[in-house]
């Protein structure tokens, strides 16, 4: 049986996969995202940046899979960033930065880019690879100062790309989206299905055998 391994510490990505009938192993990648982005240079296309980061995250965990004694594995790596005013924004990391970002994006729209990489691993070796990105337009509301400060105080927007979530508290401040909602959460199911097919895996082969209803 093929085992899916999620190369991410994101609880949101894990929740999306579990809700879709998959029970992945989780192995957290330790790649230096800033270094990879810097090596690509300032002129790199935003879509390339998130895709290369997803590829690096997926590849980084492969050597450690040998200890799991798995013979047939697909590794999924993802990276999300918000593209606004021509600039890519990852996790703000601080309240001040998150506040400034919300001041710039409130009442406007931006594009959430998510790079995806799927690796087929057999006997510890990468035998097939497929990668691509998704792009979803997010239309933001204009939260009141009180609501925004309360949101910032929760700490949620500090640790997510673009300083917002769709599936949690941040969803109150998203007017609508154009595109795949799961990709905004961090892992696009339609795109992952396509990439799995490219490496020779049917998504139904990854579903849990027991009923999920």
From Swiss-Prot:
Protein name in the entry: Nucleoside triphosphate pyrophosphatase
Pfam families to which the protein is assigned, alphabetical: Maf
Gene Ontology molecular function terms on file: nucleoside triphosphate diphosphatase activity
Keywords: Cytoplasm, Hydrolase, Nucleotide metabolism
Subcellular location field: Cytoplasm
Signal peptide residue numbers: none
NCBIfam families found in the cross-reference section: maf
Family membership: Belongs to the Maf family.
A GO biological process held by the record: nucleotide metabolic process
Reactions catalysed: a ribonucleoside 5'-triphosphate + H2O = a ribonucleoside 5'-phosphate + diphosphate + H(+); a 2'-deoxyribonucleoside 5'-triphosphate + H2O = a 2'-deoxyribonucleoside 5'-phosphate + diphosphate + H(+)
Database matches in CDD domains: Maf
Enzyme class label: hydrolase
GO cellular component: cytoplasm
Catalytic-site annotation from UniProt: 79 (proton acceptor)
UniProt-listed Enzyme Commission number(s): 3.6.1.9
The protein's required cofactors: a divalent metal cation
Primary location group: cytoplasm
Function: Nucleoside triphosphate pyrophosphatase. May have a dual role in cell division arrest and in preventing the incorporation of modified nucleotides into cellular nucleic acids.
């Amino acid at each position: 049986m093929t085992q899916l391994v999620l190369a991410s510490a994101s609880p949101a990505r894990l929740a999306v996969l579990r809700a879709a009938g998959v029970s992945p192993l989780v192995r957290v990648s330790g790649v230096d995202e800033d270094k990879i982005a810097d090596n690509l240079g300032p002129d790199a296309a935003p879509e390339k940046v998130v895709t290369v980061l997803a590829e690096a995250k997926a590849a980084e965990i492969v050597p450690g899979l040998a200890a799991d004694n798995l013979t047939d594995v697909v590794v999924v790596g993802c990276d999300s960033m918000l593209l606004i005013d021509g600039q890519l924004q990852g996790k703000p990391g601080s309240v001040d930065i998150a506040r400034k970002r919300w001041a710039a994006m409130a009442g406007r729209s931006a594009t959430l880019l998510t790079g995806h990489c799927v690796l087929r691993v057999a006997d510890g070796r990468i035998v097939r690879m497929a990668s691509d990105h998704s792009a979803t337009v997010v239309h933001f509301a204009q939260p009141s100062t009180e609501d925004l400060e309360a949101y910032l105080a929760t700490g949620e927007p500090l640790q997510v790309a673009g300083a917002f979530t769709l599936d949690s508290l941040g969803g109150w401040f998203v007017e609508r989206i154009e595109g795949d909602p799961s990709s905004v959460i961090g892992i696009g199911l339609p795109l992952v299905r396509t990439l799995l097919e490219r490496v020779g895996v049917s998504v139904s082969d990854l579903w849990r055998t027991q009923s999920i209803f």
